[in-house]
From Swiss-Prot:
It comes from Herminiimonas arsenicoxydans. GO terms for cellular component: ribonucleoprotein complex; ribosome. Gene3D superfamilies: Ribosomal protein S8. It holds the Pfam family Ribosomal_S21. The lineage of its organism: Bacteria, Pseudomonadati, Pseudomonadota, Betaproteobacteria, Burkholderiales. GO terms for biological process: translation. This is Small ribosomal subunit protein bS21. One of its GO terms (molecular function) is structural constituent of ribosome. InterPro entries: Ribosomal_bS21 (IPR001911), Ribosomal_bS21_sf (IPR038380). The keyword Ligase does not apply.
């Protein structure tokens, strides 16, 4: 569980921002969103495979030389 200690005379907004940052770093929100609904193992594999293919093509596209613009 993520906890933060309030510093003396620390505004609530600053503490809330610090809390959100720690939650984001731990990846808790993404994990909670993933577990919100049950996902079949086949659907999970299919989603992960599609993400891997997308990353692969994105990496290839970034390594290609740009087309000549004339």
């Amino acid at each position: 569980m993520t906890t933060i200690r309030l510093k003396e005379n620390e505004p609530f907004e600053v503490a809330m921002r610090r809390f959100k940052r720690t939650i984001e770093k731990t990846g808790l929100l993404t994990d909670l969103r993933a577990r919100e609904f049950y996902e079949k193992p086949t659907a999970e594999r299919k989603r992960k495979l599609a993400a891997a293919v997308k990353r692969h093509y994105k990496r290839i596209r970034s390594q290609q030389l740009p087309k000549k613009l004339y």
